[in-house]
Structure formats: structure tokens, C-alpha cells
Amino acid sequence: MSISSDPIPTTSAVDVIEKIVYDFVKPLGFRRFRRTLHRFVEGDISQVIHFQNGCPQKGIPGLLWVNLGIRVPECQEKTFTPSLPLKKYYQEYQCNIRTTLSFCTEGKDVPYRLWKSPQKIAADIICKLEQSVLPVFDILNSRDAILKYREDYPRFDQMNHLVLLEAAMIWGRRGDFPEACGLFRRYYAQVMEERKSASENGRKIYLEKGQSLSYLNERTGKTETVLAEKSGYYTIFHSPQAHLEYLKQLASQLNIPLENL
């Protein structure tokens, strides 16, 4: 069956699905803002369920993604003094802990097809939320819990390489600068080591058939071009410098010394 490009049926279907799901989570403190269901815990930590109708950037209509997120202000803003006042709600893309419902439950990206029964889709979403999402929301409902248990839920946290950095932000907001400084420096040293390993041993990148990539080989000092004869992973000996430079700037803003690393 072809996917309809008519936006009206899919929009109506998502309206039905969202209303059914919202009626289920509303007693738990969630409030609806457009396609976002949002609640605050511990005063300013956001927990978010977002309904994404299609993927316009890729020209994919007729599919529904359910995106999930948790936003800790200092982690998302990368500062010890987050901005005030709080907004009424925050979007999933503004969260620092993010995943999708399908990745959380199945470990892969499986959107819903909106030409199926909206009521059945909503029932499936509620079942998965009840079994796999709301219990995690209830555990990761405070800064203490996030520091202690975040790494227990890797499927819930597709940005989990930032755990140390964001723990530093939490400790910094609490006023424990030595702990924040130590965690930040550990993360910075980890990134430097990963960059060194990528330069010496290579790192994998995915290219579609026919794609090409020109880069500076850090082992030879020469520019090389990789042409993908088939879709798959290719090894390059180069590690981007941008994230390391960003961390240097952030350390300067936070008055964290990076000497002797």
C-alpha cells in the first residue's frame, strides 16, 4: 500500500491518537501543548512525550514517531546557572536525555503507519508507555536519581556519551565546584583519548553507495577521498576537532582549568 501524501487524514489520525494517550497520562500530571505532552518533576525537570507526524525533511508522510525526552535545565543549557523563568513546557528536541518509543522498547527505529486504526495505535502506545516508559520516568524524576540511575537505561538515553559532562553540570548547579570540575576534566580527558584513538586506529563512518568523503588522514598528513562502492561502514583516520574546541570554550566559561591533561 502506498503512503498517502494527503496531510488531512494523517493529521486527523494523530489528533485521535494523541487525545487517547493524553487522556491516559493526564492524571499523572502531563499537560498537552500542541503535539507535546509535558510534565515537570522536582520543580524544573521536564518529562516529554512528543508525537511526530511524518518526516518532512526526508519527504516521508504517513508515519508517526513517538519521541521521548527528559530535560534537566543545566544539562541542556550547559551552565551552572540555568535561565529563568521556566517556560510552560519544553519540546523533546530541547531535552538532554532523548530516545524514541520504538528504540526504547525494541532497540530500533520502527514508526507507526498512520493508515492503520488510530485506536489500535493509541492502545499500543499506551501499553508500551505503561510497561517501558512511565516506570523510567518515575525513577529518573530527580537530579539524585538521574546521577545514580541514568546509565541503567541505555535505550532511554541515545546521548549517553554525555553522562560525565552533564553530571558535572548538575554538581556545578548545586554549588559543588570541585566535584563538577573533576567530572568535567574526566570527560575532557576521555574525549581527548577517543580522538587520539580515532586518529591512530581509525573510526567507522557509514556511507551510502556512490557517496564520497574527502578528509585529512591524520596518520599520513595527506588528503584522501573515500568512494563507497556499496553502502556500508568505512574506516577513516581522522577525528573531528570541533567537540574538543567546544569543550575548551565551555571550560573557559565555567572557569574550569584544563591544565595537565
Model-derived features with residue positions:
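Amphipathic alpha-helical segments
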Residues: 10-32
